[in-house]
Amino acid sequence: VCIADDLVPPHRENNVITWKSRDLLGRIGMVFQEPEHQFAASTVRDEVAIGPKSMGKTDEEAYSIADRLLERLNLSRFAKANPFTLSGGEKRRLSVASMLAAAPKVLVMDEPTFGQDFTTWTSMVQLIAGARDQGCAVIMITHDEPLIEALGARRILVREGE
């Protein structure tokens, strides 16, 4: 309920909500199961900077955020690379970094830690926990039981579509 309070104005009989793309970007972030589906920039660094720039940050601020996240997720050496040239695990880390950079109020992630080694997995868990601790509601679709335990997350189990 408190998530909805931040996302949607109080209900009125004929409540029409018109959000601009920038408004949605600041409210909801989505990490797709197939990271390639969310890439929009020609370089890794630009991909992470899109969110902060769209939220009104200066280029300097946006690239500072991008550089920090690329460093944390061991992607700095790919800053000038095209996102589509990365390995599967690197693409997944890039997709998480690009959504975290926008600092949304709600972050929906589909299998965010799939294909990561332990060191990178740990960094991703710390970043996700940090976002959560700063007030971001995190919703994950995952088979990663250790991730759920590490975050102390509430679990909703779906079996056979129910």
What do the predicted segments below correspond to?
Residues 99-100:
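ABC ATPase C-loop
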Residues 96:
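Hydrophobic anchor residue at the start of the ABC signature
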Residues 107-110:
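Catalytic Walker B motif of ABC-type/P-loop ATPase nucleotide-binding domains
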Residues 118-120:
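Helix N-cap at the start of a conserved alpha-helix in ABC-type nucleotide-binding domains
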Residues 103:
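Conserved catalytic motifs of ABC-family nucleotide-binding domains
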Residues 142-143:
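H-loop/switch region of ABC-family ATPase nucleotide-binding domains
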Residues 60-78:
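Conserved ABC ATPase "signature" region
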Residues 82-86, 90:
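Conserved ABC ATPase signature
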